[in-house]
Swiss-Prot record:
It is a multi-pass membrane protein. GO terms for molecular function: G protein-coupled receptor activity. The gene is Mrgprb2. It comes from Mus musculus (Mouse). The chain crosses the membrane at residues 41-61, 90-110, 112-132, 158-178, 192-212, 232-252, 269-289. Glycans are attached at N9, N18, N23. This is Mas-related G-protein coupled receptor member B2. Residues 62-89, 133-157, 213-231, 290-338 are cytoplasmic.
Length: 338
């Protein structure tokens, strides 16, 4: 993500009313644009606040209250990335709101611009890895269950966090977001690297998700649909609808900016709002999937709903297994490797 992209779109100075020359005549911002920006900022603040609360609940249960497995480790790290992204956007939108509504011009610390880059790249990478793992478990089930290293999930997440942080810091330093050390050549270089990273993971996410869906619904040996597959499918779908536009916008920003003569009237805030919705929706998906066809007469705690959303056992098998019903954290399918 380029330094220009963040500074021009997120600094409070970018929202000052300006007059721009367009085809030889003067063009001034309309009240419609200002009203739209105010609405988008308020909605982004509200969604970010709600999303932080929901992701905090997921972090609490998965990090402390629940037994973790290969898949829940990824969900835990995805919730961390979403929480971090929403926190940074909440602070940035709040500072912009102070200027828009109260004309209080607060300079946003440049270091804060690095956090959305880091969090977005981490979330994208982790979600792509989730899709890849489930695809591998379908294509090579025996290898996945018997030969997969035990701590693959934790190690993979650690590597993705480190790589995303390193890329965010290097780009932030080169583009003047850290230490006020702008270098045009290295800024453009890291912009290209970041864009390549994003495009590769976009492609991997789409390809592995499509392969997974084809094997589930169209394969010669259809795979039983479990809550886990529903959770993954909905999470990927929500990202493609709400999260992907943010990545596409930053990749194409170098070209898009040439057509936006009036910065205040572009669509950045709408895209920012959609990205906040994406990070907010994941916990909602978990709880909704966990509550589907919940026929037992028992209290539906959030912990139980979250456990059921991660269930990798078909419903008919679960209903016939009383022991599994009493301990939903152990519902992950276990097969012999002999």
């Amino acid at each position: 993500m380029s330094g220009d992209f963040l500074i021009k779109n997120l600094s409070t100075s970018a929202w000052k009313t300006n007059i721009t020359v367009l085809n030889g005549s003067y063009y001034i911002d309309t009240s419609v644009c200002v009203t739209r920006n105010q609405a988008m900022i308020l909605l982004s603040i509200i969604i970010s606040l709600v999303g932080m609360g929901l992701n905090a609940i997921v972090l609490w249960f998965l990090g402390i209250r629940m037994h973790t497995n290969a898949f829940t480790v990824y969900i835990l790290n995805l919730a961390m990335a979403d929480f971090l992204y929403l926190c940074s956007q909440f602070v940035i939108c709040l500072l912009i709101a102070f200027y828009i509504f109260y004309s209080i011009d607060i300079n946003i610390p440049l270091v804060l611009y690095v956090v959305p880059i880091f969090a977005y790249l981490s979330g994208l990478s982790i979600l792509s890895t989730i899709s890849i793992e489930r695809c591998l478990s379908v294509i090579w089930p025996i290898w996945y269950r018997c030969k997969r290293p035990r701590h693959t999930s934790a190690i993979t997440c650690f590597v993705l966090w480190v790589m995303s942080l390193l890329l965010g810091l290097l780009e932030g330093k080169a583009c003047g977001l850290l230490f006020n050390s702008f270098d045009s050549y290295w800024c453009e270089t890291f912009d290209v690297i970041t864009n390549i990273w994003s495009v590769v993971f976009f492609g991997v996410l789409c390809g592995s998700s499509l392969t997974l869906l084809v094997r589930i619904f169209c394969g010669s040996q259809r795979i039983p649909m479990t809550r886990l597959y529903v959770t993954i499918t909905l999470t990927v779908l929500v990202f493609l609808i709400f999260g992907l536009p943010f990545g596409i916008y930053w990749i194409l920003y170098q070209w898009i900016s040439n057509f936006y003569y009036v910065e205040i009237c572009n669509f950045y805030l709408e895209i920012l709002f959609l990205s906040c919705v994406n990070s907010c929706m994941n916990p909602i998906i978990y709880f909704l999937v966990g509550s589907i066809r919940h026929r037992r007469f028992r209290r539906k705690t959030l912990k139980l709903l979250l456990q059921r959303a991660m269930q990798d056992t078909p419903e008919e098998e679960q209903s016939g297994n009383k022991s599994s019903s009493e301990h939903p954290e152990e519902l992950e399918t276990v097969q012999s490797c002999s």
